Amino acid sequence: MNGNSKKRTLLRNARALLGDAMAFDGRPRDMLIEGDRIAAIEAAGTLYAADHVIDLRDHLLVPGLVNGHQHSHEHFQRGRTENLPLELWMHLVRTRTPVKLTPRQVYLRTMIGAIESLRTGCTTLVDDTALGAAIDRERIDAALQAYDDAGIRALVGFAMMDKPIVDNFPFVEKHVPAALAAELRAASRPAPEAQLALVRDLARERHPQSSRVGVLVSASAPQRCTEPFLQAVRSLADDLALPVITHVQETRLQVVTGQLFFGCPMVEYLDRIGFLKPATSLIHAVWLNPREIDALARTGATAQHNPWSNLLLGSGVQPVRELLDAGVNVSLGSDGSCSTVTVNMLNVLGSAAAVSKLRGDEHARWLSAHEALHAGTLAGGRALGFGDELGSLRVGAIADLVAYRTDTVTFTPFNDPVRQLVYAERGAGLGLSMVAGEVVIEGGVLTRIDEAALLHEIERDFAELGPLYAAAEAEMQPVLAAVENIHREGLAAAVASDTYAARLA
């Protein structure tokens, strides 16, 4: 999967979470990496021949985390919002007058997420980035180059849609002034055919099964796409054997929207039109009913849990146990850093396990730390079409892995490595990261880029960009006022009585 086909790296003396079950027996191991694959795992002191040897004594070796959802176009907006539900918040990200960035600034913005991801144990990310008013290949190439340079595995999608944002909502005629609605509908956006052609063109050289930095197919959300466009998106993914992502029922209003737009909740609609298939991830999938969960299980689609984002936006808590009971693959994502402030996947693991404990009194059904780690590794690889090749430390698997120091307060005393990793480690103890068999962090230092210089350049540029973001946000106040009314009407509207309650009353 990369040009690292002959190099042999030996990781010595590491305690590891081994196999698809991530079993831990406490005994140190040697692990031989050949090219981009794990070639051998043996008792410590029994493997020798290698080009590069790294001693991982006092480290815990873990599969690299898979972040199934982030938005690189938000990285310059982290920390700018709080205490807004999704429907209001999103209009501060997609403003009427977008801040125009140079290709270099797009590169730097993308690099923020790549650096934070690598520093917190993530080796694979999905970037669902926005195209904006027009397709700009120079800026798209800049984002892809950032991932190339950082050394992370990235699958990039382009949040495709063919409807104006204002028409994603119900009750528009009632609450949005006609002149404002007309202005929003007239905003420039890429032609549907051009969006599909972009993915088809990029996939020739950047297919995720053959390129560390590849593309996938992103339909932004069912309510943002006409049915013919969704069918075209599905056909494109099938033709190219690419994974698919789409936002589905993140909020209660979106359940109401599905009922009004399609005559049923959105997962039922996607099932009806044949959109649900394996390697198709429904992002968020918070507000679900039993029929929708059955559809996910029957079709092999993935429900992706974004717990930290769903908490900060007040969206709700996904019914993870019900999904797992039905046999649905559940993966994890951070979402964008404007809503979450961070793309730290260790934070996502901990919040996924912790927030499940608010769903019901039957404590045996709460999500465990081990289940959260599985969702953030092997299940994430399965969601993206890698089968069992990504997210597991076993012979033959892709060598995407990380090691955390265990001679730290986080792991002292050393009782349960998975619980201490999921609930306490947040990246400070990361000593090693390897992607596709290449060491990208060693001794806590990023090996492929000058991190300090990049962060300094970002801060220097943002001194000018910050006021532009503030002005763009201020311009959205009339839109926020209208959407506030739509949001409140949606809260009052009924949803199917068997929908799992996602919020505390």
Predicted regions and their residues:
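His/Asp/Glu-enriched, well-ordered alpha-helical/loop segment
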Residues: 272-279, 321-408, 424
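Alpha-helical scaffold segments that flank or form the walls of functional sites
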Residues: 78-153, 194-209, 459-464
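Metal-coordinating catalytic core of metallo-dependent amide/deamination hydrolases
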Residues: 138-285
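Active-site gating loops and adjacent loop-to-helix segments of metal-dependent hydrolytic enzymes
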Residues: 76-106, 163-189, 252-277, 299-302, ...
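Active-site microenvironment of metallo-dependent hydrolases
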Residues: 1-29, 34, 374-505
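Divalent metal-coordination and catalytic microenvironments
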Residues: 14, 31, 36, 58, ...
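Glycine-enriched alpha-helix->loop->beta-strand junction motifs that scaffold or abut catalytic
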Residues: 237-242, 275-278, 295-304, 325-330
